[in-house]
Amino acid sequence: MSHSTELAGKAVLITGAAGCIGAWVAKQLRELGATPVVFDIAENRERLNLIMPDAEAVIWELGDITDFKRLLEVAETHNIEGIIHLAALQVPFCKADPVGSTRINVMGSIHILELARQRGITRMSYASSVAAPAMGDNDWLATLYGAHKICGEQMAAVYWQDWAVPSVGIRPAVIYGPGRDQGMSAAPSVALMAAEV
């Protein structure tokens, strides 16, 4: 059975789809026949408009990843059958607001895991980061963002161990291309966009 057949007609929740990776995920899901349901703090279709001609057709639900009640409401409304969790504040934002970023990155992740547990969702992936593993000879984490991501991986492992909630964590390294205009690895994309002008 192909992936497109498995996903056709199914609603997949994408948190953080206003970002670069999320926009590309929404585009791919549409092409596979799935129904992407974007959950983000603000409706910003700028990156979607950059890469897909039918960006307005994507369902967009406003909400804060730290609001579990709102997440549950969206999941019930759209009969969500899969989750791709990408919502997070990146390195510079974590450094600027340690408490707020921990609330979003860590509490947001536990809310997604709990949503999957309560709704019986068995198709879930989440973005970790190459920043998650310890670096150097002393096994230290270089950023608070990395600490958030390793925490997310550990919480996902416990949700599997204690409640059999399956998930797949992905550790992207350098992200570049259309739509990548924030974060530590945005410079190549920003330079390419500037060169096109």
Please report, for each region that a protein language model flagged, where it lies by residue:
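NAD(P)-dependent short-chain dehydrogenase/reductase
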Residues: A18, L144, A157-V197
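Active-site segment of SDR-like NAD(P)-dependent oxidoreductases
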Residues: L89-V91, V130-A134, A173-Y176
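Residues at the starts of beta-strands that form the adenosine-phosphate
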Residues: T35-V37, T122-R123, P166
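N-terminal Rossmann/SDR dinucleotide-binding element
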Residues: M1-G82
